[in-house]
Amino acid sequence: MTDQTAGTWFLRPDERGNPGTDIDRMGDVDGSWVEGNLVRPLIHGATYFRRLYEELSALRAGDRVYFTDWRGDADEKLLPDGPTIGAVLTDLAGSGVEVRGLLWRSHSDHLRFSARENRKLGTRLNQVGAEVLLDQRVRWLGSHHQKLFVVRHAGHPERDLAFVGGIDLCHQRRDDHDHLGDPQPAPMNHRYGDRTPWHDAALEIRGPVVGDLLRTFCERWDDGHPLDRRTPYRMIVQRLARMPRHPKPLPESFPDPPPAGPHAVQVLRTYGHKRPGYPFAPEGERSVARAYEKAFGIARDLIYVEDQYLWSELVAQGIHDALERSPALRVIVVVPRYPDADGALSGPPSRFGQLRAVRLLQRAAPGRVGVFDLENEEGTPIYVHAKICIVDDTWFTCGSDNFNRRSWTCDSELTCAVVDTTGTDARRLARDLRLEVWSEHLGLTRESLAALDPPAALDLWTRTAAALDAWYAGGCQGARPAGQIRAHRTEPLSRFQALWAEPLYRLIYDPDGRPHRLRRSAEF
């Protein structure tokens, strides 16, 4: 039986816009989402890495692990004293667990990417019998940004689970609620300090939707196109990484896990339009963008967003329209204080997209939109890498996509939308997630926040940020006010900066991966 609320919020198969995928032919009655799951939000990289370690360390010969990632550092510790992700996966492959991975091939480390790190992780695992591919089957200037772990147990499908979210297997992600940063840092904007405080999130999911998530992995694995351009240099790189020239077919899948809980989950993806096209998405897929459009079209009370970017008027347009349509709607957005790279050349294109998006929202509804950033108790800004969106405490998303045109049209992305199908008075998952992150950001108990309506909530956020601003303005006299939040102010651009930053932003930083017929429209 299909839950009515899920049917209202989720995309129908025809709304996904990708008839090339099998994923919508595997679900419940309407075929576009799966009910009967148990979803547990995991806030902070340290929380996620601990759960990942606990599940992986319990596997035995015959079990299976499938993962995708944007960046992987083999020496990243899952726990404070280890082991590392490379050691854990190496031990699994050597003990008879099937390990398959799809890592983005990436670009040179000299360009602040991670080709060397991804190659090292892939090489190490391939040497011990795993099969990890360096995958560059993306459109020009695109990337594989999906972050997924599927863990399967031979003969025990009820124990199967998946992890989906925004947390890579790499340095800088293992931070906790104190936000003092990962002891294994990575190069970053100097204003975040030597160990960047890092806010992130993922989902732990059990139930039949694990099958849909595995099918997403399988579609990419079974793509028969070359993994990279056929150049002598790329062929040498693949040889050095011990990548198989012809990846082995995936084994017959275990049965999908049985129902595990009251949560309906819809798997959303982005794949850019490219030539040759993906066999499973010939015209690309933009179900991430379409899902947000639908949810914003329903929103009446509160849209809460945590995001790394909030770029582009195209992406902000859906929230803008919701604000104009619903006079009671409030919008609260949390973003990083500074771009991750904010040099003389790298900073202006990043700020260009955010300035446009924020201006569009604030002009639509003065006084009903709040944009904030975070800092730890030492005053160091916290880099917001979480990708969370909660609408009316009913529908929420967590995954790899950011609020920018690149994530909604160009790069490969993987996000889960979730609706709690428990009886109306007991739908709590989205609300509990919101209260969990608000409690941390505002420095207040969940109980004190639970009764706030959206206008009062936005007022509280504004007053909390103002109190901290006033404390700094007064020379930090007395006790520091509670909370992490500051009013966010994007550094403006000069006319000259805007002149050259705009083409760089549109072509490189935030490219449009839609088919040409859609690019002059607001459609996805």
Identify the function of each model-found stretch:
Residues 1-524:
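Charged, low-complexity intrinsically disordered terminal segments
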